Amino acid sequence: LTCVKSNSIWFPTSEDCPPGQNLCFKRWQYISPRMYDFTRGCAATCPKAEYRDVINCCGTDKCNK
């Protein structure tokens, strides 16, 4: 499985997930109005959302763009 690690306009990067990590995730963390921090990567299980987080998990290559 290949997941997006960072998704900048010029240099999107991806990573091959290690054995046992069969999900890609993208986390939006609310900072202030119109400002969010994005975290992307591989996971064995879908991370739990914390305060003001939205998490999307998926199981296909680069599905967490």
UniProtKB/Swiss-Prot annotation:
Check the record and name the InterPro entries matching this protein. Snake_3FTx (IPR003571), Snake_toxin-like_sf (IPR045860), Snake_toxin_con_site (IPR018354), Toxin_cobra-type (IPR054131)
Identify the tissues in which this protein is expressed.
Expressed by the venom gland.
Please state the protein's primary subcellular location: secreted
Q: What are the disulphide bonds in this sequence?
A: C3-C24, C17-C42, C46-C57, C58-C63
Hydrolase listed as a keyword? no
One Pfam match, by short name?
Toxin_cobra-type
Q: Name one GO cellular component term.
A: extracellular region
- Which PROSITE patterns does the record match to this protein? SNAKE_TOXIN (PS00272)
**Gene3D superfamilies the UniProt entry points to:** CD59 (2.10.60.10)
Q: Extract the CDD domains matched here.
A: TFP_snake_toxin
Is Transferase tagged as a keyword?
no
Task: Please give the Gene Ontology molecular function terms for this protein.
Answer: toxin activity
Q: Which UniProt keywords apply?
A: Disulfide bond, G-protein coupled acetylcholine receptor impairing toxin, G-protein coupled receptor impairing toxin, Neurotoxin, Postsynaptic neurotoxin, Secreted, Toxin
| Function (record text) | Binds irreversibly and specifically to M1 (CHRM1) muscarinic acetylcholine receptors, blocking further binding of antagonists and preventing the action of agonists.
The family assignment reads:
Belongs to the three-finger toxin family. Short-chain subfamily. Aminergic toxin sub-subfamily.
- Assembly with partners or alone: Monomer.
Q: What is this protein called?
A: Muscarinic m1-toxin2
* Species: Dendroaspis angusticeps
